[in-house]
Curated annotation (Swiss-Prot):
The protein's name in its UniProt record: Small ribosomal subunit protein uS11
Function: Located on the platform of the 30S subunit, it bridges several disparate RNA helices of the 16S rRNA. Forms part of the Shine-Dalgarno cleft in the 70S ribosome.
Any one GO BP annotation for this protein: translation
Single GO MF descriptor: structural constituent of ribosome
Keywords associated with the record: Ribonucleoprotein, Ribosomal protein, RNA-binding, rRNA-binding
Record-stated family: Belongs to the universal ribosomal protein uS11 family.
GO cellular component: cytosolic small ribosomal subunit
NCBIfam families named among the record's database cross-references: PRK05309.1 (NF003698), uS11_bact (TIGR03632)
InterPro entries documented for this protein: Ribosomal_uS11, Ribosomal_uS11_bac-type, Ribosomal_uS11_CS, Ribosomal_uS11_sf
Organism: Fusobacterium nucleatum subsp. nucleatum (strain ATCC 25586 / DSM 15643 / BCRC 10681 / CIP 101130 / JCM 8532 / KCTC 2640 / LMG 13131 / VPI 4355)
Protein's UniProt keywords contain Ribosomal protein: yes
Pfam family, one: Ribosomal_S11
Length: 129
């Protein structure tokens, strides 16, 4: 029995001039999601999807590569200006912002949206190494 060929639908590139880059940086990984102004995701990458495994996902270099790849896809969709919202205490925060600028996106505003507890949950205990 012959296999049926399925026609692949090619994605049309949209023209989105402005957007928002959401950087979620934890100690273990960094996730970069670039959305349009309404919040619809245009592209996203993380340390893991960029080819890093284990503890290397949390490094600034992994965050830099993830931001470059996400910015490349966003620029293919016509994005030129981006507003950056950074969340979390990780090491890839600054590396992501620098990488977005180096990729050719114009950063208009940088906002820190890290959630701060008003004495909510008990934090994890200190590591003894």
């Amino acid at each position: 029995m012959a296999k049926k060929t399925v026609a692949k639908i090619k994605k049309k590139s949209k023209n989105i001039p402005n957007g928002v880059a959401h950087i979620h940086s934890t100690f273990n990984n960094t996730i970069v999601a670039i959305t349009d102004v309404d919040g619809k995701v245009v592209s996203w990458k993380s340390g893991g999807t960029s080819g890093f495994k284990g503890t290397k996902k949390g490094t600034p270099f992994a965050a830099q590569i993830a931001a470059e790849q996400a910015a490349q896809i966003a620029m293919e969709n016509g994005m030129r200006k981006v507003e950056v919202k950074v969340k979390g205490p990780g090491s890839g925060r600054e590396a992501c912002i620098r990488s977005l600028q180096a990729a050719g996106l114009e950063v208009t505003k940088i906002t820190d949206v890290t959630p701060v507890p008003h004495n909510g949950c008990r934090p994890p205990k200190r590591r003894r190494v």
